[in-house]
Amino acid sequence: IGAVVDRTSLDWDDPVEKWLPEFKGDAKGKILLRQLLSHTSGVRPYLPEPRVDNYNHLDSAIIEILPLDTVFTPGSRFQYGGLAMQIAGRMAEAAMGKEFETLFQELLAQPLEMKNSHFTPINTDGGHAPMLGGGLCTTLNDYIHFLSMIYHEGTYEGKRILTAETVKEMQANQVKDALVSPGEYTEIALGQSHTGIYGLGEWRELIDKKTGEAYQISSPGWAGAYPWINKRDSVYGFFIAHVVGSSAKEDGFSSFYGSPVISRTVSEIVK
């Protein structure tokens, strides 16, 4: 989505209704793109049960989201969830006139040489709408190219993929004055509380107390995927552990909340 912002008139402060007219007259129409990607939008975190998941495109996903009420005033609270990102993805599609998988391939995967990465794997069963929050199928080798680009402020192998301004915006505090309830990922995983826990699509794990800038960012997955970048230690990596069933094991270890142990261990080894 940042690549679309760089190339079109789509802006982080655009309301949903500017690009998706079906939201005009709906409370969700006034939500800003940056709120959708920072979990401060007020959109319900997930579809109610039983989830309707038999569509193949984001425009169909939007039809399921449109009737749902918001759960709080946009910008007033932080609540993690994936539905808002579906709306953001549809805004990007509207801005460039292409489906999300095509945008991903043309703007990121191809220039980053991510040859085995897709949001919509080829499958005759249907039901594979791009799930922006956790739906990327990739490999260690592919994803490390993406992390390298983010680490190098938007460049990869001498090619400009994202503007430095967009990368900075992604890593900036986007939660701002929104209420953060106790028990969020950063508090449980790191054993500390700080404001500005989230940017645009990424957690701000470790913060420089003097500047307020995040020097460690991440995007851990519930099933055991943990990509991170630590700018202070000049380290970035991607760890994958396949977890069957509950993320929390009988011995108390959680592949999700235990993720920062990996980044901390790697930094200690490198030092």
Regions found by a protein language model. Name each.
Residues 83-89, 141-145:
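Well-ordered alpha-helical segments within folded domains of soluble proteins
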Residues 145-177:
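Flexible, glycine-rich surface segments
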Residues 4-44, 48, 67-69, 90-132, ...:
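Active-site helix/loop module of the DD-peptidase/beta-lactamase fold
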Residues 179-183, 207, 246-271:
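Short, gly/Ser/Thr-rich active-site loops of penicillin-recognizing serine hydrolases
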Residues 116-141, 172-238:
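Active-site Gly/Thr loop motif
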Residues 77-80:
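Cytochrome P450
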